[in-house]
Amino acid sequence: MPRRNDIRKILVIGSGPIVIGQSAEFDYSGTQACKALKAEGYEVVLVNSNPATIMTDPELADRTYIEPLTVKYLDEILRIEAEMLAASGSNGKFAVLPTVGGQTALNLAVELADAGILDKYGVELIGAKLDAIKKAEDRLLFKDAMTRIGLDVPRSALVNNIRDGLEFATKIGFPVIIRPSFTLGGSGGGIGYNREELMEILARGLDLSPVHECLIEESVLGWKEYELEVMRDLADNVIIICSIENMDPMGVHTGDSITVAPAQTLTDREYQAMRDAALLVMREIGVETGGSNVQFAVNPQTGRMTVIEMNPRVSRSSALASKATGFPIAKIAAKLAVGYTLDEIPNDITRMTPACFEPTIDYVVTKIPKWQFEKFPGADENLGPQMKSVGEVMAIGRTFKESLMKALRSLETGKRVGAEVLEPRRLTQRLVTPQPERLNYVRFAFRQGLSVREVARMTSMDPWFLYQIKEITDTIAAIGDATFDNVSPEQLRKAKRMGISDERLAEVWGLTGNEGVAKVRELRQGHGIRPIYKLVDTCAAEFESATPYFYSSYEEEDEAPQTDKRKVIILGSGPNRIGQGIEFDYCCCHAAFALKEDGFEAIMVNCNPETVSTDYDTSDRLYFEPLTLEDVLAIYEHETANGADAGMIVQFGGQTPLNLALRLKQAGVKIIGTSPESIDLAEDRKSFGKLLEQLQIPQPQGATATSVEEALASAERIGYPVLVRPSYVLGGRAMVIAYDAAAVSHYMKEAVEYSQERPILIDHFLEDAVEVDVDALCDGTDVVIAGIMQHIEEAGIHSGDSSCVLPAVDLAPQVLDTIRDYTRKLALSLKVIGLVNLQFAIQRDKVYVIEVNPRASRTVPYVSKATGVPLAKIASRLMTGRKLSEFLPENIASGKDLGTGAHYYVKSPVFPWNKFPGVDTVLGPEMKSTGEVMGVADNFGEAFAKAQLSAGLILPSSGTVFFSVNDHDKAALVPLAKQYIDLGFQIVATEGTAKVLHKAGIQAESVYKVKEGRPNIVDLIKGQRIQLIINTPRGQDTFFDEQAIRRAAVLQRIPTITTIAAARAAAEGIAASQRKHITVNPLQLLHAGHAVK
């Protein structure tokens, strides 16, 4: 069937901010879909609230709306677009594609249909029909559908109250699994082992489910879990793209499981039965066009197979299957949605076979999740049906062993394999209960002499996987006995074929530091043991592959032919994590696009399956490899073996490539852009302090310390409060504001493991300062300031966790001039080539430099979207020797910033509190947000309100505000309270705060603090009497009392504001939303006339 010519315009719904359970994979799928639809000649309109995505780049759609993903805003966008279509005189149809934006887009599509909005504007849903979405997503309808086609499902009941849930659980017996309907990443789900746990989880699940219902399901804990990625077209052709096996058993969310493709432990007969079942599911649910994933559980004792669930959309597993096979699922799903059939679409990798050929792979792929519980003290680390990982890595090897070991070293835990802190007495508990360190305990169990059978019994992992892990452990032990001087080339080759790194071998032989690793490398290369590169080609080498997509292995035949083009290798940012997210991937992609346009061969190195950077057509050559010194050097040597000229970019991938920069340069790699020495100078406390003195630029008083005594003496000299942190970290990892000596000594005892032989930094903390972020471009001669962003939270809250606004709203002109002056001086003194990010604190109109990062920062995508100038593209061109005068001559001549026209752009962070209900929500110098959103309007208040709405904080337009502010903030309290009273709010306050308000003649109801008596403030929150909380904590004493308030607020989903500055911004936002109807503007219109390509 050819493409549908009756459709003229297609709205693609994005997935919004990055949250746990919905990550960068939807930027990758949305980008592919937009490109495919635009290439087919459709008018493409995109809506998404996340500025850090490639899909929101203005060139990917005809109109791009960065707006909140709510029914109200989509109604307005659909109205405008439907009117434009009607006015154009075209009789073409208007369609919405909701299957590439994750759960967010699907839920929105259902809401728009149910509210009659799609019918109102004559809009058709494509990619998935409404009844198919409902059948797959509604637990009861799905269960009935499976029963109708004769497939087994776990016994279950759909409940909408706790009594029915208890009744059913008692009937089928504990434990039971609780799964809320229409939620993402298993939000609100859990395992109830008894009545109390069931009641607690069910109450939370019913609250989080948009339709207030949960499925209570018979436990299949310990069963094996499989997924099939399936595609179907309108002619009923169905193909299986990939089978995926979870190494962890049922009971752990698939996003938190180690997964392997293709499935390793199925017999052919079992696989065929599962394949047949998946085809039946697709047809019964009615997914006519596009990709879905179907999840199965198999009882290892009896072989009973049950269907667990299906997603009628492109999912996290689709991204993995896509990268594992080279088959562009999202692109093909978009083409199927507009009427093509699989046999009409060519396979982009081979360019000889159609898409209806099922991919075949002759290698093994392993995905391992990345968790960051260290960011959330108090969070429950046990893994269950609710997803908790923040990112993932993928590795490809010729065997399972090789791909597992490569994936483990891609994780960048900062801890060496073999150096984990293990507690022998907790071995049994750690094997039985799934948690992030479980694999380390499995290896430890084998070192302690436990058998595969015993470990399989405790972990419910398939013995096949455990035998593989035991073989790796045994090989490492044997090679350790062989010593460095006596090891044979055969033993060494065997270890390398298993994926064991040089660093691990050095450790086994007791060779320390970088020199030890270099010795192993020399020995290995002396024996001629070097990696070769194999192709990912979708067809197990049966056809020629046209796209160079490689992975390393220690075999004989190399499939990566050398080229003699001028090339640039871009080091990616590895797994998504807090502090280093999709923003850095965005910069890497832009570098690849610009370099390709300029005639360079762009080579990408990364190991994250969720991102656009690892898409087969982003760069000219893609190496899916770990970002370690060994792996990166091997690629560089391979690419330059024939004498080809290759530069390497390290400033776009966040901290990961920067940590390798100096060692790469010492090994002879040509690093382009800002030199590793300059990067080091900016990070090194003493040298940087000297530079600031020479330039006469003030910074907060600071010192360094390597012991508790030194730290206490320094803090005393500088004066409390102090900011204590390790050197060389990203995302404010392990930072704290200390108000007294006890806090400093506690920190020093905790922090030493992060310092990597580098000292702890102690700074005077500037209280009540306004923080400012600056992004600038520099070519060594000229500097152009891209944006001066004013933070809405005060200094001391990590810049990644603070909302910020461009242009700055209330900084004095002379302060802005000082910031510009300091920025230019520092960029030129540090010899920056490319991007630089500076952070300033302004206290009583005096400007202090907090830090300078001569690299791309997480604000680059946001500033690029706000100014219409692709900063990362220009920066990568500067690195190849081009000059700013070619791109921004007017700004150089006038000295002006890039500017944002007549609009305000507010960036707000998004937090994962609902996944970690036990964690305190107060913000500080350590970053905790997982993603970001942007609000755009012609006034600050509306832009802030939009950003808050996109981040999931719905500011109330009326009701009661609870105030509890510390003594220091009481001066600002009265005018703030008046603002809220003028907006029509009532005020409730704690005793001290209420007294201040009464004195000023403001009416406020007084309420008990948590420890003072009942009914206290937490009772009011739980009784839904409070609509907004303004609670500014200070120091340790008040901290615990307020933790209870903030926790209760998270559970009741009441917006909580912890700084006076943000409370003022919220008041402006509420005023804007009370004032007028909503406005929406596409980026293309905002930047018409001044965008730079």
From Swiss-Prot:
The gene designation is carB
Could you say which residues bind Mg(2+) 2 here? 309, 311
Q: Which UniProt keywords apply?
A: Amino-acid biosynthesis, Arginine biosynthesis, ATP-binding, Ligase, Magnesium, Manganese, Metal-binding, Nucleotide-binding, Pyrimidine biosynthesis, Repeat
Domain description: The large subunit is composed of 2 ATP-grasp domains that are involved in binding the 2 ATP molecules needed for carbamoyl phosphate synthesis. The N-terminal ATP-grasp domain (referred to as the carboxyphosphate synthetic component) catalyzes the ATP-dependent phosphorylation of hydrogencarbonate to carboxyphosphate and the subsequent nucleophilic attack by ammonia to form a carbamate intermediate.
Which of this chain's residues are annotated to bind Mn(2+) 4?
A: 851, 853
The Gene Ontology terms for molecular function here are:
ATP binding; carbamoyl-phosphate synthase (ammonia) activity; carbamoyl-phosphate synthase (glutamine-hydrolyzing) activity; metal ion binding
Question: Sorted alphabetically, which CDD domains does this protein's record hold?
Answer: MGS_CPS_II
What job does the chain carry out? Answer: Large subunit of the glutamine-dependent carbamoyl phosphate synthetase (CPSase). CPSase catalyzes the formation of carbamoyl phosphate from the ammonia moiety of glutamine, carbonate, and phosphate donated by ATP, constituting the first step of 2 biosynthetic pathways, one leading to arginine and/or urea and the other to pyrimidine nucleotides.
UniProt EC number: 6.3.4.16, 6.3.5.5
Q: Where does ATP 1 bind?
A: 139, 179, 185-186, 218, 220, 225, 251-253, 295, 309
Which residues of this UniProt protein bind Mg(2+) 1?
A: 295, 309
Region Allosteric domain: start-end pairs: 953-1093
Domain (ATP-grasp): residue spans on this chain? 143-338, 689-880
Residues binding Mn(2+) 3 are 839, 851
- Which Gene Ontology BP terms does the record give? 'de novo' UMP biosynthetic process; glutamine metabolic process; L-arginine biosynthetic process
* Residues that coordinate or bind ATP 2: 725, 764, 766, 771, 796-799, 839, 851
Provide a GO CC annotation, any one: cytoplasm
What's the protein here called? Carbamoyl phosphate synthase large chain
Q: Quaternary structure per UniProt?
A: Composed of two chains; the small (or glutamine) chain promotes the hydrolysis of glutamine to ammonia, which is used by the large (or ammonia) chain to synthesize carbamoyl phosphate. Tetramer of heterodimers (alpha,beta)4.
Native organism is Acidobacterium capsulatum (strain ATCC 51196 / DSM 11244 / BCRC 80197 / JCM 7670 / NBRC 15755 / NCIMB 13165 / 161)
Top EC category: ligase
